[in-house]
Amino acid sequence: MSDILKNDWKNYLQSEFQKDYYINLRKFLINEYNSKTIYPNMYDLFNALHFTPYNKVKVVILGQDPYHGPGQAHGLSFSVNPGVKTPPSLINIYKELHTDLGCYIPNNGYLRKWADQGVLLLNTVLTVRAGEANSHKNKGWEEFTNEVIKVLNKKETPIVFILWGNNAISKTDFITNPKHLIIKSVHPSPLSASRGFFGSKPFSKTNNFLISTNQEPIDWQIENI
């Protein structure tokens, strides 16, 4: 795993792989992958970083932990592979996107188009046991993703941090650079979306901020496939 980062993230995160917490996390993960069903596939663990290089990040959408159903998680928060049914949280994201910007609700949940435009789709924890949400909480991933947020905080180019739910909001303390914008709300899960996610307009707020800082807005429309 220590040489898994193939792009410019390597320059910022390579030293993490030598730290005690990560060595312990790696041992834990080797045992978990060998003895249980773990999502995502181990080769997809760092897809968020691979699909969105450090120098391209304009927006961060921070999730909790990966989807824990068969075939769903592929390393991007909230996204599922083509052919997999769109999960309820993402359906709610699409509903808000429709209300906010008029985007139609697509027939798939594959968010690679966002990642390719500079939207880092990161979970606070990058692995999960099948059928057990939060089963890899407090095993070391939080420390790793804290570091991701810290190095992004140092960027001179303004970034929008979209924090949905308490796990994501807990990262607020690491975002201290006044150039960046933080957008917070409850999680888009059906359990909480009606308590402040719907109507929060995160997508138009993000694009307005990007335009105001002379950056290209995001084309949020995921097309049918």
Curated annotation (Swiss-Prot):
Broadest EC class assigned to this enzyme = hydrolase
Residues annotated as catalytic: D65 (proton acceptor)
Q: Check the record and name the SUPFAM superfamilies matching this protein.
A: Uracil-DNA glycosylase-like
- Per the record, what are the reactions this protein catalyses? Hydrolyzes single-stranded DNA or mismatched double-stranded DNA and polynucleotides, releasing free uracil
Tell me one GO molecular function of this protein.
uracil DNA N-glycosylase activity
| Chief subcellular location | cytoplasm
The gene designation is ung
EC number of the protein: 3.2.2.27
Q: Which GO terms describe its biological process?
A: base-excision repair, AP site formation via deaminated base removal
Family (UniProt): Belongs to the uracil-DNA glycosylase (UDG) superfamily. UNG family.
CDD domains assigned to the protein according to its UniProt record, in alphabetical order: UDG-F1-like (cd10027)
PROSITE patterns per the UniProt record, alphabetical: U_DNA_GLYCOSYLASE
The protein's location, in the record's own words, is: Cytoplasm
Q: What is this protein called?
A: Uracil-DNA glycosylase
Q: What is the recorded function of this protein according to its Swiss-Prot or TrEMBL entry? A: Excises uracil residues from the DNA which can arise as a result of misincorporation of dUMP residues by DNA polymerase or due to deamination of cytosine.
The record's keywords, sorted A to Z, are: Cytoplasm, DNA damage, DNA repair, Hydrolase
What is one GO cellular-component annotation here?
cytoplasm
